[in-house]
A protein has these predicted regions:
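Small-residue-enriched hydrophobic alpha-helices in membranes
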Residues: 1-149
Length: 149
């Protein structure tokens, strides 16, 4: 099994940036999101172990405080692209040392986190009679899926 010990400090930092970067892509997709979406990202970390079976790698990821890349981009679109790049880099690092099964578990974890963030608030006027996930959030999740490929 692959664990934190198998990666350099820089590689591990990149792996830790992947999940919150995916969550931020979803938050940015719909005019900045909400506090509820931000909290849903934190909740996803605590629920991850129950949903993804045994994985020392995910145990190590979940055990650490989520890392956020503090880079500042000019526009929301640039920030979104920067965070999608973080997701791509994280999966690329994992592919070099983790098993295929562990890479797939990480993908499912990141995608599950993004989906929880998207479902955190109901769309529509005052949250009434709206959808749980907006079209913009669905598009963001599709982009995250592509980045994880």
């Amino acid at each position: 099994m692959t664990s934190k010990a198998d990666f350099t400090e820089e590689e591990w930092k990149t792996i830790l940036e992947g999940p919150p970067s995916a969550g931020l892509v979803v938050i940015l997709s719909d005019r900045g999101g909400s506090v509820r979406e931000t909290f849903s990202m934190a909740r996803a970390y605590t629920e991850a172990r129950r949903q993804h079976g045994e994985s020392e790698l995910l145990d190590d990821v979940v055990a650490e405080k989520p890392e956020m890349d503090r880079a500042r981009a000019g526009s929301p679109e640039e920030l979104k692209q920067h965070n999608l790049d973080n997701v791509r880099q994280a999966i690329a690092v994992l592919k070099t040392k983790a098993t295929e099964e562990e890479v797939d578990e990480y993908r499912r974890f990141v995608l599950g986190l993004a989906e929880r963030v998207a479902e955190a608030r109901k769309e529509g006027f005052l949250g009434l009679s709206g959808e749980r996930v907006s079209d913009a959030e669905r598009a963001a999740i599709t982009e995250i899926e592509q980045a994880l490929a």
